[in-house]
Structure formats: structure tokens, C-alpha cells
Amino acid sequence: GFFGGSHDVLVARRHWRDDAVDTTGLAGSATLSVTEHRVWTQWAVNAMHAQYLQNKHVKYVAVFQNWLRPAGASFDHLHKQVVGVDSLGASLQAEIARVNANGNIYRDFVDWAYRAGLVVAANDGAVALAGVGHRYPSLEVYSTGPVCEPWLMEPEQVDAVSDLVHALHQATGTQVPLNEEWHYRAPGVAKEMPWRVVLKWRVSTLAGFEGATKIYLKTIDPRSLRERVVRELEQLSASQAGALAPGIRLGDECGQPYLQYGRA
């Protein structure tokens, strides 16, 4: 850890895939097995919980994964960062204010995404969809369980989120720079906020227009992103037995999701 123990870096074992023959064969989240990705996710959950237990000044623990240098990675090796900070950021405070005004805001958004045809995949504990309103093309995974804090969830609930995140990484591949960001309810926040993971594809360059207008141009819209990812997952499921975790439903098979946060 760095900075007095409030910055942990989790480093994966492999740098190259076992079958790599050139420098394009980097080992990333997409090349992990289902079981390995579950362990990788639980390791990060344990690390974030440990920071809250070990440092009373930590108000929020940020968990993120920068994949490849264009996405901010210091080195092209699979790693997660777990960083404890002593205050809630402005963005999180604004989100909490919106939640205080409407406790159903996350359900409302997921319901809207379903009606808009943006659901990518689902299982019995989570739902994945094409995100809206991000600076980059993005995919989101929401836990549909009743518990908000990842470290308080049953292992199978964490696995449900992990399995969909893993599937989205596989659909993305290892050649696309991306940021994986975790969002959840911080300790001390009264209103329920479900755990969600956002994958942002860093495939566009922000320039003067975006800075001047705060209008962010993207090369792929949410519906096209959804169609592309569903197609990749369907092909993967058909061609590689066991590549996706059991119980994952794709595209129109998913049905309408329901977030149970606040129902514990």
C-alpha cells in the first residue's frame, strides 16, 4: 500500500495469456476464467472493507481498474486500485442529494433502460445495461439484491455482479482501453444506494469542443453499444462452452429487472 496504507494495489499473477505468441497476448479481466474473476472481485471487496476497518478517517474507498495506458494505467498489467479518501467527493455528494430527493432513482433508471431496449444481460443477482450520460461509451452492472454494501453481501451476490462484469470484459476484449469504476453506498449514508460497476471504453479523445460546451461526442450510441455487446456475448456463448458463468441471460431473454435495494 501507498500513502500511509490507504492506497492498495492488487496485482494479478499473469502478464501474458498462457497461449500468448506476441505482445498482443496481454492477460486482462477478459482472459480470466469465471472462477478467477470471482476471486479477483472478492479480493477487491475484502480490501475495501479492510480500509474502513483499519482507518477511522476513511470516509469513502474508491475501487477502480485502469486497463491500458490510454485509460490512465501506469503499466499494462492487470491491477485494481483501492484508495481510501477522507471526504466524499462533489460528484458523490450530488448523487446523494438526488437520492435524498428520490429514493427510487436507480429503479427508475433501470426501468427506463429496460423500456429503451438497453439491457445487455442479467442473472439472478445483477443486471447489465448500456449506460447513458457518460463521457465515453459505457456499460453498467447493477446488483439487484437487497444489500447495498459489497462487503455485507453473501458470496453468491458478489459472484452475480462479478459474472456480469466478467462477461462485459470478455465482450470488450483486451485491446480496448477502459476504466472499471465501482459505486456503492458509503458508510454513514442513510439512503440506500445499490452497488453498481461501470465500464467506460476510452475510445474517444476529449478536446476543445467538449471542454467549451460540456457536450461529449461519442462514436457509438447506447443502442448500438448494446447490440454490439449482446452479439459478442451470443457468439462467445455459442463458440466456447463455459466462457460465461452459468445462469446468464442475454439480450431479449432477460425480462424486466427489479432492484431490491432497501428491501433487506
Residue ranges and their predicted role:
Residues 1-264:
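HIT superfamily nucleotide-processing domains
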